[in-house]
Amino acid sequence: GSEYQSWNKDALVIIKAPTGCGKSHFILNELLNYAMQQGRRILYLVNRTILKDQLIKKCNEQVAELCIRYGQIIKIWDYIRICTYQEIEQKLKCGNADPLNANIQDEKGNPIESYYYVVYDECHYFYADADFNPGTEISYVYLTQSFRHVVQIFMSATIENMEEKIKKDLTYTVGFKLHLKPFKKYEMEIDYDYVDLHYIADNKEILELIKTEKNEKWLIFTDNIDKGNELAKDIRN
């Protein structure tokens, strides 16, 4: 729906939805279009360079469509910035205490880099990569503290390990008194209705299934190399 249009500037939003359910589509279409209408900016953070490249490609395609639709140049990059967590971590490690200029203000006290929304895509990254990347804690603290007063949107299909930490760290603000921040959670259940489940006793049953469904593509995993080679040989024959 359009509930996102009522998110206040210091709202905390958690979106839990399976991969492929349209989380990034919502940001790049619904939220971005609304942000452009309102003159607001989005900082979109991702955990992998390949994902960043895909999002940039989608944005450029969207620019082309909007230019054709409205007959004028649409400066989409005035309204969205896409970064990886690792880019920020690298700058922090090199001594740049504020790589996004989030805490620098102009003479009127306004941030020189002003964002209304900060999107943490695949936010389980802060937990999943922490065992081998100490930079995750550095970037998490910098980002969440620097953007306490904007809409922070955390998205993941596996957000369970981060959800309690996010709530504990961010659902309050400190001023003259302690008060809770607005908190929103949206959850989409995983639908496995499309899965056709079979229990297989041995390789012969797999071969019979393949023979009866000749037009289907098969991806087979095995925990034994010898059995896997034997099955591959039987399939070829």
Language-model-detected regions and their locations in the chain:
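Interdomain hinge/linker at the junction between the two RecA-like core domains of SF2 helicases
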Residues: 159-210
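Conserved P-loop
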Residues: 25-70
